[in-house]
Amino acid sequence: MNIHEYQAKEILHKFNVPVPKGFVAMSAEEAETKINQLKSDVLVVKAQIHAGGRGKAGGVKLAKSAEEAQQFVKGMLGITLVTHQTGPNGQQVRRVYIEEGSSIKKEYYLSIVIDPKLSRPAFIFSSEGGMDIEEVAKNFPTKIVKLDIDYAADFASFDSRKLSNIFNLSPEQIEKITNVAKNIYDTFIATDANQIEINPLVETNSGDFIALDAKISFDDNALYRHPEIVELRDYDEEVKEEIEASKHGLSYIKMDGNIGCMVNGAGLAMATMDIIKYYGAEPANFLDVGGGASKETVTEAFKIILSDSNVKGILVNIFGGIMRCDIIASGIVEAAKGMSIKVPLVVRLSGTNFEKGKRILEESGLNIIAADELDEAAQKIVKEVE
């Protein structure tokens, strides 16, 4: 689950991470009533969307007066912001964040994530803040350092000496960066986050370190422990199909292709998307129905897939383990009859009761194209949508 920058800063502030003073506004009138709370010669107006690259897209503006800030607010609210992370359709700006400007001496990058190989937190630090960390890794690989955290030693395992040795930072700078990192780590653990990114972490002319921008994402599997975080969810920032899928226990991610996919198991789903691409087409989605899908779940999955107008064909790829292929086949037939599916439908069943499942499909009287192997199924659906 993702949240807005202003929400991330509110959380970080509670854990004593220094952030600029600011407020959120959902209308120009609201901004006008609150603008006098800020006492700074420079104000920063930021569009609040769940995507990076706002600055290059015109979603971050520097104002030299309250009046100019209000003009930026009026011009920003309601526009559709297109960045490298939003996709071509962009995201509508429904709220803006206005904060006091900071005197910037140097920009750094600091984040904490879960290292998937080690299954433990790791800090990423760079002396090149303010730009995508992927670009830094590509163009300045020597300016990034990874600091692993040992759960047994907790934050005491944060090796600040690496920062000193690699980036030639003073003891005072190291102490302040370490303090910020400690508070970020506390936030990370307490909120069950899976990423906190500060980009940039700025050193001001007075020598202080401030989180000028902040991004936090949380582990969906731990949200039941944090109802206060769930309340921060902004459904306007999420894909409607993904919201609907989550209501039915489905894992769905919308993509830009035209072949809908319904698969059980994340690994098999990714393999299915890969083979579709291998044969020259593009998947329209990732959809994992899980190991305990019912007829009702399959029907909902079809509804979600077909709600995407780009879908020109559907590939169902099921391996029956816990989930029986005959149950899935019955669900497919029931859904196809009830929804009058008009796009080509290729189904590949393998595993528990797959022969029963194939008979159910064959005897349904529906125009369902059967396949025994994934390779065969992919070629058939690609041919159908060409």
UniProtKB/Swiss-Prot annotation:
Function: Succinyl-CoA synthetase functions in the citric acid cycle (TCA), coupling the hydrolysis of succinyl-CoA to the synthesis of either ATP or GTP and thus represents the only step of substrate-level phosphorylation in the TCA. The beta subunit provides nucleotide specificity of the enzyme and binds the substrate succinate, while the binding sites for coenzyme A and phosphate are found in the alpha subunit.
Name of protein: Succinate--CoA ligase [ADP-forming] subunit beta
GO biological process, one term: succinyl-CoA metabolic process
Record-linked InterPro entries: ATP-grasp, ATP-grasp_succ-CoA_synth-type, ATP_grasp_subdomain_1, Succ-CoA_synthase_bsu_CS, SUCC_ACL_C, Succ_CoA_ligase-like_bsu, Succinyl-CoA_synth-like
Pathway annotation from the record: Carbohydrate metabolism; tricarboxylic acid cycle; succinate from succinyl-CoA (ligase route): step 1/1
HAMAP family on file: Succ_CoA_beta (MF_00558)
Required co-factors: Mg(2+)
Binding positions (ATP): K46, G53, R54, G55, E99, S102, E107
UniProt keyword terms in alphabetical order: ATP-binding, Ligase, Magnesium, Metal-binding, Nucleotide-binding, Tricarboxylic acid cycle
Cellular component annotations (GO), alphabetically ordered: cytosol; succinate-CoA ligase complex
Subunit structure as annotated in this protein's UniProt entry: Heterotetramer of two alpha and two beta subunits.
Class of the enzyme per the UniProt entry, highest EC level: ligase
EC assignment: 6.2.1.5
Species the sequence originates in: Wolbachia sp. subsp. Brugia malayi (strain TRS)
Catalytic activity: succinate + ATP + CoA = succinyl-CoA + ADP + phosphate; GTP + succinate + CoA = succinyl-CoA + GDP + phosphate
Positions with a binding annotation for substrate: N264, G321, I322, M323
Residue ranges constituting the ATP-grasp domain according to the UniProt record: 9-244
GO MF terms held by the record: ATP binding; magnesium ion binding; succinate-CoA ligase (ADP-forming) activity; succinate-CoA ligase (GDP-forming) activity
Free-text comment on the cofactor: Binds 1 Mg(2+) ion per subunit.
Family per record: Belongs to the succinate/malate CoA ligase beta subunit family.
Positions annotated to bind Mg(2+): N199, D213
